[in-house]
Protein backbone atom coordinates (compact mmCIF):
# COMPACT_ATOMS: atom_id res chain seq x y z
CA UNK A 1 0.00 0.00 0.00
CA UNK A 2 2.85 2.39 0.79
CA UNK A 3 4.31 1.91 -2.69
CA UNK A 4 0.95 2.46 -4.40
CA UNK A 5 0.12 5.59 -2.39
CA UNK A 6 3.41 7.30 -3.19
CA UNK A 7 3.25 6.27 -6.84
CA UNK A 8 -0.35 7.46 -7.29
CA UNK A 9 0.43 10.77 -5.57
CA UNK A 10 2.91 11.55 -8.36
CA UNK A 11 0.67 10.36 -11.23
CA UNK A 12 0.13 13.93 -12.57
CA UNK A 13 3.90 14.28 -13.01
CA UNK A 14 4.06 11.10 -15.10
CA UNK A 15 1.32 12.50 -17.34
CA UNK A 16 2.96 15.92 -17.59
CA UNK A 17 6.30 14.32 -18.40
CA UNK A 18 4.84 12.67 -21.52
CA UNK A 19 3.24 15.95 -22.59
CA UNK A 20 6.27 18.18 -21.98
CA UNK A 21 8.64 15.71 -23.63
CA UNK A 22 6.42 15.53 -26.72
CA UNK A 23 6.27 19.34 -27.03
CA UNK A 24 10.04 19.66 -26.70
CA UNK A 25 10.68 16.89 -29.22
CA UNK A 26 8.22 18.34 -31.74
CA UNK A 27 9.58 21.86 -31.27
CA UNK A 28 12.95 20.89 -32.71
CA UNK A 29 14.84 19.84 -29.58
CA UNK A 30 14.81 16.01 -29.56
CA UNK A 31 18.28 15.88 -27.98
CA UNK A 32 17.07 17.66 -24.85
CA UNK A 33 14.04 15.37 -24.64
CA UNK A 34 16.36 12.36 -24.89
CA UNK A 35 18.72 13.72 -22.21
CA UNK A 36 15.75 14.38 -19.91
CA UNK A 37 14.45 10.84 -20.39
CA UNK A 38 17.87 9.29 -19.80
CA UNK A 39 18.49 11.37 -16.68
CA UNK A 40 15.09 10.47 -15.27
CA UNK A 41 15.65 6.77 -15.94
CA UNK A 42 19.17 6.79 -14.46
CA UNK A 43 17.92 8.64 -11.39
CA UNK A 44 15.27 5.97 -10.93
CA UNK A 45 17.79 3.11 -11.20
CA UNK A 46 20.44 4.65 -8.92
CA UNK A 47 18.10 6.03 -6.26
CA UNK A 48 16.02 2.85 -6.17
CA UNK A 49 19.06 1.25 -4.59
CA UNK A 50 20.05 4.26 -2.43
CA UNK A 51 16.57 4.77 -0.98
CA UNK A 52 15.89 1.06 -0.44
CA UNK A 53 19.15 -0.10 1.14
CA UNK A 54 21.62 2.59 2.37
CA UNK A 55 18.73 4.78 3.57
CA UNK A 56 16.62 1.78 4.68
CA UNK A 57 13.33 3.01 3.22
CA UNK A 58 12.41 -0.32 1.62
CA UNK A 59 9.63 -0.45 -0.99
CA UNK A 60 8.36 3.09 -0.23
CA UNK A 61 11.89 4.25 -1.09
CA UNK A 62 11.70 2.49 -4.45
CA UNK A 63 8.34 4.17 -5.06
CA UNK A 64 9.82 7.56 -4.17
CA UNK A 65 12.71 7.10 -6.62
CA UNK A 66 10.29 6.13 -9.39
CA UNK A 67 7.93 8.99 -8.53
CA UNK A 68 10.62 11.69 -8.51
CA UNK A 69 12.17 10.63 -11.85
CA UNK A 70 9.50 12.33 -14.03
CA UNK A 71 9.85 15.52 -11.95
CA UNK A 72 13.54 15.60 -12.87
CA UNK A 73 12.74 14.95 -16.54
CA UNK A 74 10.20 17.79 -16.59
CA UNK A 75 12.70 20.17 -14.98
CA UNK A 76 15.31 19.37 -17.64
CA UNK A 77 12.81 19.66 -20.51
CA UNK A 78 11.57 23.01 -19.16
CA UNK A 79 14.88 24.61 -20.17
CA UNK A 80 13.65 24.48 -23.76
CA UNK A 81 10.84 26.96 -23.14
CA UNK A 82 13.33 29.66 -22.10
CA UNK A 83 15.41 29.36 -25.27
CA UNK A 84 15.08 31.95 -28.03
CA UNK A 85 14.65 29.16 -30.57
CA UNK A 86 11.55 27.86 -28.78
CA UNK A 87 8.25 28.47 -30.57
CA UNK A 88 6.23 27.17 -27.61
CA UNK A 89 5.31 29.47 -24.74
CA UNK A 90 3.18 29.10 -21.64
CA UNK A 91 0.21 31.48 -21.91
CA UNK A 92 -3.03 32.04 -20.04
CA UNK A 93 -5.79 30.68 -22.23
CA UNK A 94 -9.05 28.82 -21.80
CA UNK A 95 -9.00 25.27 -23.21
CA UNK A 96 -10.45 24.89 -26.70
CA UNK A 97 -13.06 22.10 -26.79
CA UNK A 98 -12.34 21.56 -30.50
CA UNK A 99 -8.59 21.16 -29.97
CA UNK A 100 -9.14 18.93 -26.94
CA UNK A 101 -11.44 16.70 -28.99
CA UNK A 102 -8.84 16.52 -31.78
CA UNK A 103 -6.10 15.68 -29.29
CA UNK A 104 -8.21 12.94 -27.75
CA UNK A 105 -8.89 11.46 -31.18
CA UNK A 106 -5.20 11.38 -32.03
CA UNK A 107 -4.37 10.02 -28.59
CA UNK A 108 -6.63 6.97 -28.78
CA UNK A 109 -3.99 5.02 -30.71
CA UNK A 110 -1.34 5.68 -28.07
CA UNK A 111 -3.77 4.89 -25.26
CA UNK A 112 -4.68 1.53 -26.79
CA UNK A 113 -1.00 0.80 -27.39
CA UNK A 114 -0.17 1.41 -23.73
CA UNK A 115 -3.19 -0.56 -22.57
CA UNK A 116 -2.42 -3.54 -24.80
CA UNK A 117 0.38 -4.87 -22.60
CA UNK A 118 -2.07 -5.16 -19.70
CA UNK A 119 -4.65 -6.93 -21.86
CA UNK A 120 -2.07 -9.35 -23.26
CA UNK A 121 -0.63 -10.10 -19.83
CA UNK A 122 -4.05 -10.82 -18.34
CA UNK A 123 -5.21 -13.07 -21.19
CA UNK A 124 -1.93 -14.97 -21.42
CA UNK A 125 -1.71 -15.50 -17.66
CA UNK A 126 -5.24 -16.93 -17.48
CA UNK A 127 -4.68 -19.25 -20.45
CA UNK A 128 -1.27 -20.46 -19.30
CA UNK A 129 -2.48 -21.01 -15.75
CA UNK A 130 -5.26 -23.22 -17.08
CA UNK A 131 -2.98 -25.10 -19.50
CA UNK A 132 0.16 -25.71 -17.44
CA UNK A 133 -0.10 -24.04 -14.04
CA UNK A 134 2.11 -21.57 -12.18
CA UNK A 135 5.35 -22.63 -13.87
CA UNK A 136 3.98 -21.60 -17.27
CA UNK A 137 2.91 -18.24 -15.82
CA UNK A 138 6.44 -17.75 -14.47
CA UNK A 139 7.82 -18.58 -17.92
CA UNK A 140 5.57 -15.94 -19.45
CA UNK A 141 6.92 -13.45 -16.91
CA UNK A 142 10.37 -14.00 -18.43
CA UNK A 143 9.05 -13.54 -21.97
CA UNK A 144 7.01 -10.46 -21.00
CA UNK A 145 9.97 -8.70 -19.37
CA UNK A 146 12.07 -8.96 -22.51
CA UNK A 147 9.05 -8.13 -24.67
CA UNK A 148 8.65 -4.81 -22.82
CA UNK A 149 12.22 -3.88 -23.76
CA UNK A 150 11.68 -4.90 -27.39
CA UNK A 151 8.45 -2.92 -27.64
CA UNK A 152 10.18 0.14 -26.17
CA UNK A 153 12.79 -0.04 -28.94
CA UNK A 154 10.14 0.08 -31.66
CA UNK A 155 8.20 2.78 -29.84
CA UNK A 156 11.43 4.79 -29.94
CA UNK A 157 11.62 4.42 -33.72
CA UNK A 158 7.99 5.50 -34.09
CA UNK A 159 8.37 8.50 -31.76
CA UNK A 160 11.57 9.56 -33.49
CA UNK A 161 9.88 9.55 -36.89
CA UNK A 162 6.66 11.22 -35.76
CA UNK A 163 7.81 14.88 -35.64
CA UNK A 164 9.48 14.54 -39.05
CA UNK A 165 6.35 13.00 -40.57
CA UNK A 166 4.19 15.73 -39.03
CA UNK A 167 6.47 18.38 -40.51
CA UNK A 168 6.13 16.82 -43.97
CA UNK A 169 2.37 16.61 -43.53
CA UNK A 170 2.23 20.28 -42.51
CA UNK A 171 4.11 21.19 -45.71
CA UNK A 172 1.77 18.99 -47.82
CA UNK A 173 4.79 16.85 -48.68
CA UNK A 174 3.05 13.47 -48.95
CA UNK A 175 6.01 11.92 -50.77
CA UNK A 176 8.38 12.94 -47.98
CA UNK A 177 6.05 11.50 -45.35
CA UNK A 178 5.86 8.19 -47.22
CA UNK A 179 9.66 8.06 -47.51
CA UNK A 180 9.90 8.45 -43.74
CA UNK A 181 7.34 5.66 -43.31
CA UNK A 182 9.45 3.38 -45.52
CA UNK A 183 12.63 4.37 -43.67
CA UNK A 184 11.00 3.78 -40.28
CA UNK A 185 9.57 0.44 -41.41
CA UNK A 186 12.93 -0.66 -42.80
CA UNK A 187 14.65 0.35 -39.57
CA UNK A 188 12.08 -1.59 -37.55
CA UNK A 189 12.55 -4.68 -39.72
CA UNK A 190 16.35 -4.51 -39.39
CA UNK A 191 16.07 -4.11 -35.62
CA UNK A 192 13.65 -7.04 -35.43
CA UNK A 193 16.08 -9.24 -37.37
CA UNK A 194 19.01 -8.22 -35.14
CA UNK A 195 16.93 -8.70 -32.00
CA UNK A 196 15.80 -12.16 -33.05
CA UNK A 197 19.31 -13.20 -34.09
CA UNK A 198 20.66 -12.28 -30.64
CA UNK A 199 17.72 -13.95 -28.94
CA UNK A 200 17.97 -17.14 -31.01
CA UNK A 201 21.68 -17.45 -30.37
CA UNK A 202 21.48 -16.75 -26.63
CA UNK A 203 18.07 -17.98 -25.53
CA UNK A 204 19.46 -20.18 -22.76
CA UNK A 205 21.53 -17.49 -20.98
CA UNK A 206 18.76 -14.92 -21.49
CA UNK A 207 16.20 -17.17 -19.80
CA UNK A 208 18.66 -18.08 -17.02
CA UNK A 209 18.76 -14.44 -15.84
CA UNK A 210 15.22 -14.88 -14.45
CA UNK A 211 15.60 -18.51 -13.41
CA UNK A 212 17.39 -18.21 -10.07
CA UNK A 213 15.83 -21.46 -8.82
CA UNK A 214 17.17 -23.36 -11.86
CA UNK A 215 13.77 -24.82 -12.69
CA UNK A 216 14.25 -27.07 -15.73
CA UNK A 217 10.54 -26.99 -16.58
CA UNK A 218 10.33 -23.20 -16.41
CA UNK A 219 13.47 -22.90 -18.56
CA UNK A 220 11.96 -25.28 -21.11
CA UNK A 221 8.68 -23.33 -21.29
CA UNK A 222 10.44 -19.96 -21.51
CA UNK A 223 12.96 -21.24 -24.09
CA UNK A 224 10.28 -22.29 -26.58
CA UNK A 225 8.12 -19.30 -25.68
CA UNK A 226 10.85 -16.75 -26.42
CA UNK A 227 11.63 -18.24 -29.82
CA UNK A 228 8.01 -18.38 -30.93
CA UNK A 229 6.75 -15.15 -29.32
CA UNK A 230 9.53 -12.91 -30.62
CA UNK A 231 8.81 -13.82 -34.25
CA UNK A 232 5.95 -11.36 -33.83
CA UNK A 233 8.32 -8.39 -33.76
CA UNK A 234 8.98 -8.77 -37.47
CA UNK A 235 5.39 -7.53 -37.86
CA UNK A 236 5.00 -5.56 -34.61
CA UNK A 237 7.79 -3.13 -35.49
CA UNK A 238 6.02 -2.18 -38.72
CA UNK A 239 2.65 -1.93 -36.98
CA UNK A 240 3.99 0.40 -34.28
CA UNK A 241 5.75 2.64 -36.81
CA UNK A 242 2.69 2.68 -39.09
CA UNK A 243 0.35 3.59 -36.22
CA UNK A 244 2.64 6.50 -35.37
CA UNK A 245 2.70 7.56 -39.03
CA UNK A 246 -1.10 7.46 -39.32
CA UNK A 247 -1.45 9.62 -36.23
CA UNK A 248 1.16 12.08 -37.52
CA UNK A 249 -0.71 12.60 -40.81
CA UNK A 250 -4.01 13.24 -38.99
CA UNK A 251 -5.65 9.88 -39.62
CA UNK A 252 -6.72 8.99 -36.08
CA UNK A 253 -9.37 6.45 -37.07
CA UNK A 254 -6.88 4.31 -39.02
CA UNK A 255 -4.23 4.68 -36.30
CA UNK A 256 -6.75 3.60 -33.66
CA UNK A 257 -7.88 0.64 -35.80
CA UNK A 258 -4.28 -0.58 -36.07
CA UNK A 259 -3.64 -0.23 -32.33
CA UNK A 260 -7.00 -1.74 -31.38
CA UNK A 261 -6.38 -4.74 -33.63
CA UNK A 262 -2.93 -5.54 -32.29
CA UNK A 263 -3.65 -4.54 -28.70
CA UNK A 264 -7.06 -6.09 -28.07
CA UNK A 265 -9.08 -7.69 -30.87
CA UNK A 266 -6.57 -9.80 -32.79
CA UNK A 267 -4.44 -10.79 -29.79
CA UNK A 268 -7.43 -11.96 -27.73
CA UNK A 269 -9.00 -13.84 -30.66
CA UNK A 270 -5.72 -15.50 -31.65
CA UNK A 271 -4.95 -16.43 -28.04
CA UNK A 272 -8.29 -18.17 -27.55
CA UNK A 273 -8.29 -19.98 -30.90
CA UNK A 274 -4.64 -21.03 -31.05
CA UNK A 275 -4.45 -22.12 -27.41
CA UNK A 276 -7.46 -24.38 -27.99
CA UNK A 277 -5.77 -25.89 -31.06
CA UNK A 278 -2.11 -26.09 -30.03
CA UNK A 279 -1.98 -25.68 -26.26
CA UNK A 280 0.95 -23.69 -24.85
CA UNK A 281 2.63 -23.26 -28.23
CA UNK A 282 -0.63 -21.76 -29.45
CA UNK A 283 -0.47 -19.14 -26.69
CA UNK A 284 3.08 -18.19 -27.68
CA UNK A 285 2.09 -18.13 -31.38
CA UNK A 286 -0.86 -15.81 -30.70
CA UNK A 287 1.40 -12.75 -30.63
CA UNK A 288 3.07 -13.27 -34.05
CA UNK A 289 -0.27 -14.35 -35.55
CA UNK A 290 -2.11 -11.26 -34.27
CA UNK A 291 0.69 -8.94 -35.41
CA UNK A 292 0.67 -10.55 -38.88
CA UNK A 293 -3.10 -10.03 -39.13
CA UNK A 294 -2.70 -6.42 -37.98
CA UNK A 295 0.08 -5.84 -40.53
CA UNK A 296 -2.30 -6.93 -43.32
CA UNK A 297 -4.97 -4.57 -41.98
CA UNK A 298 -2.45 -1.73 -41.70
CA UNK A 299 -1.22 -2.22 -45.28
CA UNK A 300 -4.82 -2.06 -46.46
CA UNK A 301 -5.46 1.15 -44.52
CA UNK A 302 -2.27 2.76 -45.83
CA UNK A 303 -3.04 1.80 -49.42
CA UNK A 304 -6.67 2.90 -49.22
CA UNK A 305 -5.75 6.58 -48.72
CA UNK A 306 -2.29 6.52 -50.23
CA UNK A 307 -3.11 9.31 -52.65
CA UNK A 308 -3.87 11.77 -49.80
CA UNK A 309 -1.09 11.06 -47.32
Language-model-derived ranges and their functions:
Residues 50-57, 118-145, 149, 167, ...:
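Helix-terminus/linker motif at the lipid-water interface of multi-pass membrane proteins
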Residues 22, 49, 66, 79, ...:
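Transmembrane alpha-helix boundary and packing residues in multipass membrane permease domains
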Residues 6-25, 33-41, 62-75, 155-158, ...:
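Short runs within selected transmembrane alpha-helices of multi-pass transporters and secretion channels
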Residues 4, 8, 31-38, 76-79, ...:
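Hydrophobic faces of transmembrane alpha-helices in multi-pass small-molecule transporters and flippases
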Residues 1-10, 54-108, 165-232, 273-309:
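Short alpha-helical transmembrane segments in multi-pass integral membrane proteins
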Residues 6-15, 41, 74, 110-122, ...:
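Hydrophobic alpha-helical transmembrane segments in multi-pass membrane proteins
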Residues 44-48, 74-78, 148-152, 196, ...:
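Hydrophobic transmembrane alpha-helices of multi-pass small-molecule transporters
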Residues 14-33, 139-203, 236-258:
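Small-residue-rich hydrophobic transmembrane alpha-helices
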